[in-house]
C-alpha cells in the first residue's frame, strides 16, 4: 500500500544512523541538548526560571543571548515620561513571584523594571545570559540537525550552534521612525518613545508628538504640563478607554489608586487572601475577551460607556468631539486607556492636529495648514509588526522566514513556523495578546516548548517541524473565527494586514481566549509535526526495555501507586 509518510527534505534515512539494540542503555535515557533563546525579557527569564527551578533538566544546556546590557526587554527599552502598564499590577507578574509591594493598581514602567531586576537576582536567572550580543542570522543545517548561528558582540562576529532555537524577542521590539520626508533634516531633538533619552530636558520646549496609540496616550499628558507648547499630530482617531478592570478600582470607573501600607502588609502576611485577590483580578482581566466580540451585549456596553465618557471629557470642546471619537467599532484598534490625555489636549498650551505632515523641515513641520516650529519631535509611531525576526532565518530546504512572512505571517498557535525545525517563538503571530496578562501567555508557551525539549531529548529525536498543512488549517480557522471579533472590522491597526485579493487578515490576535490557548498547548499534539529520529528505528529510544530506576539501589519499583 502507498506510504503517507513525509517526503520533505531531511526525512531521508541517509541522515540517520543504523539502529542496533543497546542492551546496556535503559529506555528514555535523555541525550544532551543545547537550547539557545534570543532575548532576556519576560520570555527568556521565564524560560530560565523554569529550567533552573520548576523543571530542571540536567541534560539541557541553556544559553540566552541578549542584545542589551541588562534584562527587562520592553521595560528596559521604554523609559519615556508616563510609561506604564494598563494591565492591573496584581496580574502583571511572573507567576512564580507574586508581588505584594506594588505601589499602585496600574504601575509605571520604572517600577516594573525594578521588579524584574529584583526577581532576576532573587532566582539567579542571569547565569545563563550573555549580554550585549545580537543574533545576526540563523541557518538550519540538515546534516547536523542543528541551527548554525552567527552573532555579534561589541563589534566581534562569532559563531555558535544549537539543537533548539527559541525566539524571545517579542512582537514589539523593533521600533520604527515615521515615513516622513525630511526626518533626518530636523535640527532640534528627535526622539522615539521606545528610544527616549532620559537625560534630555524637555521642559519649556515646543513639542510635537506624532501618533495617538498607547504610548502617545501616556506621553502627551506627561509632557503637556511643563511644555511651552504641545501639538499632537493624529492621522486616525482612537478610542480613549477606561483602564482594564475598572470595577476593581476604588471608584469603580478605572481611576488608578495607591495601595495603602496596611493593604500591602496584609498581602504579605496572608498569602491565601492575597492569592484570592490576585485570582479575582486575573478573572477580571480574562473576561475582557467578551467585550471584543462584535455585536455582543458586553461590546455594546463598552462602546456606550467609553463614548459617553469621551463626550463628557470633551464637553468644553464640542468642536473636537467628531474629530476625536472614532466611527469604527471600539476595540478594533488596541484599547488605549488614557488618563488625562483628552484633558491635556484641551489645555491652553496644547492642541490636537489632524493636518497631514507633508515634510519635516530643519525647524519643524510643513503641513497642509502651514509651517510650525518645534524644539522636540517625539515619535510615538510604533513598531515593525511584521513578525519577521530581527535576524535572518533560513530553514529547511533554504526556506526564508522574511520571504514567507513578507505579506502575511502564518504560524502554528503563535509558537511554531512551518519549515523551521526545532524552532519555537514566544508571542508569535495570532497570540492571545488582546486580553489577559502576557506573562501568563508566556508561561503557557514556555511549558509547551519545554515539553518538546524533553520529548526530543528522551526519545532520541533528530528534529521536529510543524507541518505546512497544520499551519494552513490553523490559519484558515483563525481567519474565519476572528470575523466574530472587532479586530477584523476594518480599522487602521497593526493587528491586521491587507493582502492582495483578501480582506484585512488579523495576524496579531488569537482566535479565542487565553484559556482556550492554554488548554490547547497543554498537549504537544505531535500529529501536527514531522518528527525525524536519529536512528533508523523510531523506537530506538526504548533502549533495553527497562527504566533507569530499576537498576538503582533505592529505585521505586511501584512509583505508579
From Swiss-Prot:
Its EC number is 1.14.13.-. Keywords: FAD, Flavoprotein, Monooxygenase, NADP, Oxidoreductase. Transmembrane segments: none annotated. It holds the Pfam family FMO-like. Induction: Expression is positively regulated by the azaterrilone A cluster-specific transcription factor tazR. Its cofactor is FAD. InterPro entries: FAD-bind_Monooxygenase_sf (IPR051209), FAD/NAD-bd_sf (IPR036188), Flavin_mOase-like (IPR020946). Binds 1 FAD per subunit. Signal peptide: none annotated. GO terms for molecular function: flavin adenine dinucleotide binding; N,N-dimethylaniline monooxygenase activity; NADP binding. Pathway: Secondary metabolite biosynthesis. FAD binds at residues 74-77, 86-87, 92. NADP(+) binds at residues 84-86, 212-218, 235-236. FAD-binding monooxygenase; part of the gene cluster that mediates the biosynthesis of azaterrilone A and other azaphilones, a class of fungal metabolites characterized by a highly oxygenated pyrano-quinone bicyclic core and exhibiting a broad range of bioactivities. The first step of the pathway begins with the non-reducing polyketide synthase tazA that assembles one acetyl-CoA starter unit, five malonyl-CoA units, and catalyzes a series of Claisen condensations, methylation, PT-mediated cyclization, and finally releases the first hexaketide precursor through the R-domain. Belongs to the FAD-binding monooxygenase family. This is FAD-binding monooxygenase tazF. The lineage of its organism: Eukaryota, Fungi, Dikarya, Ascomycota, Pezizomycotina. The gene is tazF.
